[in-house]
């Protein structure tokens, strides 16, 4: 169906880390050089979790008017966009060199944002109609009760 369970976010750290080449990890971590492999893995995993959290929040911001977010089941397209945005978040920590391979990450991020903008406008669907805002059962409806009018033309006559 193109949906998957959403336990933590719209993508996993493993999925995001698969998209990053090993030689990029040091530049993502930043100025501190970490020789110990376990320590390096902990650092990049923590950064990746933050990047995923930010990506999911960004996606939810675009989709909140059309869908009930966060999704309980992640549509496949949202998984892809979350990975692209999270990778961009990681790579852009130290700036994007548009003449290098980072340009690909910038292009994928821009494409993701363009797609989300179109979803927000209603021209594209993410395939999660069961979670669309306002698609719930309206059989119970709602009632509105108010007191009678206090001020009217007749009651205010002469003022």
What do the predicted segments below correspond to?
Residues 1-78, 140-159:
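Conserved short "hinge" loops at termini or chain/domain junctions
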Residues 2, 88-159:
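Short loop/turn elements at secondary-structure junctions
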Residues 77-88:
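Core structural elements
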């Amino acid at each position: 169906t193109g949906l998957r369970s959403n336990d933590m976010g719209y993508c996993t750290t493993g999925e995001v880390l698969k998209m990053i080449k090993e030689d990029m990890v040091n530049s993502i971590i930043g100025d501190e050089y970490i020789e110990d492999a376990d320590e390096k893995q902990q650092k990049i995993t923590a950064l990746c979790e933050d990047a995923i959290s930010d990506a999911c929040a960004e996606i939810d911001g675009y989709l909140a008017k059309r869908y009930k977010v966060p999704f309980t089941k992640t549509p496949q397209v949202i998984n892809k966009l979350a990975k692209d945005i999270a990778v961009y978040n990681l790579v852009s920590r130290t700036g994007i060199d548009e003449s290098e391979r980072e340009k690909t990450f910038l292009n994928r991020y821009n494409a993701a944002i363009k797609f989300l903008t179109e979803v927000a406008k209603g021209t594209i669907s993410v395939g999660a109609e069961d979670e669309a805002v306002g698609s719930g059962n309206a059989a119970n409806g709602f009632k509105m009760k108010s007191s009678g009018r206090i001020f009217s033309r007749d009651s205010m006559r002469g003022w």
